A protein has these predicted regions:
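Conserved catalytic scaffold of divalent metal-dependent phosphoesterases
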Residues: 16-19, 50-53, 57-146, 150-153
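Residue-level preference for short coil/turn positions at secondary-structure junctions
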Residues: 4, 29-30, 55-57, 112, ...
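P-loop/Walker A phosphate-binding loop and immediately adjacent motor/lid segment at beta-alpha junctions
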Residues: 29, 83-92, 160-162, 172
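Active-site neighborhood of phospho(di)ester-bond hydrolases with catalytic His/Asp-centered motifs
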Residues: 10-13, 34-39, 43, 60-65, ...
Length: 197
């Protein structure tokens, strides 16, 4: 399987936070391919700015669970109070055009030797068994699987396949910093960001 010949930026879990997005905006100009692994919305108030910026400047974008909850009006009874509150707020703020644009986003992308998703059935993928399930979804020549959702950095190698979660550029969880990932050739680097939003 071929290595990644392009300079690739992988980031996830922006959650409508303009300040976090501005941290990586300069990086977008220095890469050949930019990938966003979902959760553009939720928690933050910078909905319009983040939707416009990501849709205009990022090459490959998948739908996250926070976008899906905001545009499909699914039942929120099982969600945490802060998730319910932010989803209801987001539903009120989205325009019909924005909802249409978000509805057009796929939940999975296969691009060259890459597989991109936010998660599998909204599960938190955190262990070897979870990562191997992602590998099972990878098609023939696919080498990389990128996902988000947990806000935690993951780099897992299995039979020449690589599973990567770049973490969250807004807020890390379980001791992880805010971060994104850069890939060039065989080099994979997590870039940690300062500050908590």
């Amino acid at each position: 399987m071929s290595k990644c010949a392009k300079r690739v930026l992988v980031f996830s879990d922006l959650h409508a936070n303009k300040r976090a997005l501005l941290d990586i905006a300069p990086v977008l100009k220095k890469v050949d391919l930019s990938i966003f692994c979902g959760d553009l919305l939720g928690y933050g108030n910078d909905i319009d700015y983040c939707i416009n910026f990501v849709l205009e400047n990022v090459d490959l974008i998948v739908l996250g669970d926070h976008e899906r909850m905001a545009i499909t009006h699914e039942n929120l009874d099982g969600q945490l109070p802060e998730v319910r509150a932010s989803t209801i707020y987001t539903r009120c703020k989205l325009s019909p055009k924005q909802k249409e644009l978000l509805l057009s986003l796929p939940t999975e992308i296969w691009h060259e030797n890459l597989y991109i998703t936010h998660s599998i059935n909204d599960e938190y993928l955190r262990n070897k068994e979870d990562f191997e399930r992602l590998c099972e979804k990878m098609r023939g020549g696919t080498r990389y699987a990128f996902f988000g959702h947990t806000h935690e950095q993951v780099l897992y190698r299995h039979n020449e396949r690589i599973v990567l979660n770049p973490g969250s550029i807004t807020k890390g969880r379980r001791g992880f910093p805010r971060s994104y990932a850069l890939i060039h050739g065989d080099n994979i680097e997590f870039v940690n960001l300062e500050g908590i939003f």
